[in-house]
């Protein structure tokens, strides 16, 4: 999707037919919106660019329209194959999320029988594939800052997006603004820690349902990672309640009553089936999702941010291309090593074995993510795929000195060209120092995003406080500390709309 509008003659006939059919399926919509073109398509929906004929939407949600005076909106047609609950969930979350300039709000929703559309602002932006190889470190900083600001707002509502990826974060390079879209897979985060605050609570949680009987679902959602805080070094119980499988039965050690799980499972199955929400896009899913952790949190979105940042620094997209969960874990092994993956698996009560690998580094890259990115860039520099003016050489130069010359955060940079005057030489040296510092702190953020333990992985709010974003944060607050950012500001007209105008499908 870009800011350019196609000529009607350039629109393919099949797209024209789709738009005519949409008018037919939703009678009366032609009086409010004029369809312009189809701008996107996914598994569960299609998105069309349209003109807001009445001006009602563009007026009430003016802060969300980046081009002043724009009257374009996006109509998202949700396919009838989507379950009613899924449709309700997405519309309801969009409704709840209204209030941030970095999250696309639900402006309107219409339903005729099984046909449902959601009306959102139209955001002119550039496709990620067109700029990820050329975005300088300052642009990378702004991109990730905008994304983390959006996630900070979403996570503050207790919502997990679950599908963070470049196509769901629309970024306008000229304006330096981004917006998070597509809440089709989003869900509320469960408060597992309050559900299981002690060993006795664990017994009740694992073995009973709301009616006082056994709940299979509770066992499927339980993950040993929830109980780690109960077994800290200061705790009297140094060994967590292990679970073993014997003849189709789950036996909880430490004098916890066993529960027969034979019913509903294969008769001779000796392994407890582990179920968890694995929704998301391959290549962007966190280890706990791949390992079917039942206690997933907003931290899975932070891992996805790390994948995007890795693509920007390594100038490669997509970064991971595995077709299944097992291959996804092996891809992580090549970077972090199978020993790290084994530790991660143990957090979730799993074992992890990897044999016959061509890449046989149990500890992964010795210098971690810096060495991995250096390896990616070095290969491209060797074969000459970067143009001579590429900003990738700034990252490559930083890593070259960081890994091989072992320079400090304030390196002795090369002297500027001798034919420069003193002012130009000073400005160049200052620029070089800023670039070096930005890269140093950027890799700190990257490492925090890729923390294997979700409880230790930084939140969006924590990442925004890192030195990497200092210069952007300074522009966000007044001297007295009052926020000047529009992120949490809702106009009075938008607030009124929340109460009056948008009617959602009832559960």
UniProtKB/Swiss-Prot annotation:
Keywords: ATP-binding, Cell cycle, Cell division, Kinase, Magnesium, Meiosis, Metal-binding, Mitosis, Nucleotide-binding, Serine/threonine-protein kinase, Transferase. It catalyses: L-seryl-[protein] + ATP = O-phospho-L-seryl-[protein] + ADP + H(+); L-threonyl-[protein] + ATP = O-phospho-L-threonyl-[protein] + ADP + H(+). The active site is at 163 (proton acceptor). Pfam families: Pkinase (PF00069). SUPFAM superfamilies: Protein kinase-like (PK-like) (SSF56112). One of its GO terms (biological process) is protein-containing complex localization. InterPro entries: Kinase-like_dom_sf, Prot_kinase_dom, Ser/Thr_kinase_AS. One of its GO terms (cellular component) is Dbf4-dependent protein kinase complex. Its cofactor is Mg(2+). SMART domains: S_TKc. ATP binds at residues 39-47, 76. GO terms for molecular function: ATP binding; identical protein binding; metal ion binding; protein serine kinase activity; protein serine/threonine kinase activity. Its EC number is 2.7.11.1. It comes from the Eukaryota. Residues 33-469 form the Protein kinase domain. Present with 1600 molecules/cell in log phase SD medium. Serine/threonine-protein kinase. Needed for the initiation of DNA synthesis during mitosis as well as for synaptonemal complex formation and commitment to recombination during meiosis. Required for HTA1-HTB1 locus transcription repression. Associates with DBF4 and ORC2. Belongs to the protein kinase superfamily. Ser/Thr protein kinase family. CDC7 subfamily. This is Cell division control protein 7. It comes from Saccharomyces cerevisiae (strain ATCC 204508 / S288c). The gene is CDC7.
């Amino acid at each position: 999707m870009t800011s350019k509008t196609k000529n009607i003659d350039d629109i393919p006939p099949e797209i024209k037919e789709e738009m005519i059919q949409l008018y037919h399926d939703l009678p009366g919509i032609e009086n409010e919106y004029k369809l312009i073109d189809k701008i996107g398509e996914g598994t569960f929906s299609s998105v069309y660019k349209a003109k807001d004929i009445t001006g009602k939407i563009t007026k009430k949600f003016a802060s969300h329209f980046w081009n002043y005076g724009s009257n374009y909106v996006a109509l998202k047609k949700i396919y009838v194959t989507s379950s009613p609950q899924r449709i309700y969930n997405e519309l309801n979350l969009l409704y709840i999320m209204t209030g941030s300039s970095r999250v696309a709000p639900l402006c309107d929703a219409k339903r005729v029988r099984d046909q449902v559309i959601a009306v959102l602002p139209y955001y002119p932006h550039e496709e990620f594939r067109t700029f990820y190889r050329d975005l300088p470190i300052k642009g990378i900083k702004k991109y990730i800052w905008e994304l983390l600001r959006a996630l900070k707002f979403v996570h503050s509502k207790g919502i997990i997006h679950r599908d963070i990826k470049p196509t769901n974060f629309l970024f306008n390079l000229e304006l330096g603004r981004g917006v998070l879209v597509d809440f089709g897979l989003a869900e509320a985060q469960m408060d597992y820690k309050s559900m299981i605050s002690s060993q006795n609570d664990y017994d009740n949680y694992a073995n009973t349902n709301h009616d006082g009987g056994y709940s299979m679902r509770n066992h499927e959602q339980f993950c040993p990672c929830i109980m780690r805080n109960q077994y800290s070094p200061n705790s009297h119980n140094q060994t967590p309640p292990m679970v073993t499988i014997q003849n189709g039965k789950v036996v909880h050690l430490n004098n916890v009553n066993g529960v027969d799980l034979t019913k509903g499972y294969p008769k001779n199955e000796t392994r407890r089936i582990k179920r968890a929400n694995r929704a998301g896009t391959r290549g962007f899913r966190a280890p706990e999702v791949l390992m079917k952790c039942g206690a997933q949190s907003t931290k899975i979105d932070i891992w996805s941010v790390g994948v995007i940042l890795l693509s920007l620094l390594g100038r490669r997209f997509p970064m991971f291309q595995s077709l299944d969960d097992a291959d996804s874990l092996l891809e992580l092994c090549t970077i972090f090593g199978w020993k790290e993956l084994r530790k991660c698996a143990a957090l979730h009560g799993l074992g992890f074995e990897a044999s016959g690998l061509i890449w046989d580094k149990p500890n992964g890259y010795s210098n971690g993510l810096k060495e991995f990115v250096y390896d990616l860039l070095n290969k491209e520099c060797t074969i000459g795929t970067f143009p001579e003016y590429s900003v990738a050489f700034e990252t490559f130069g930083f890593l070259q000195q960081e890994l091989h010359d072992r320079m400090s955060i304030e390196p002795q940079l090369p002297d500027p060209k001798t034919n420069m005057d003193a002012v130009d030489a000073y400005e160049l040296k200052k620029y070089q120092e800023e670039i070096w510092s930005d890269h140093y702190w950027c890799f700190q953020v990257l490492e925090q995003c890729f923390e294997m333990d979700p409880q230790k992985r930084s939140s969006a709010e924590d990442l925004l406080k890192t030195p990497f974003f200092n210069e952007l944060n300074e522009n966000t607050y007044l001297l007295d500390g009052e926020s000047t950012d529009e992120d949490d500001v809702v106009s009075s007209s938008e607030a009124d709309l929340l109460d009056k105008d948008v009617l959602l499908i009832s559960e």
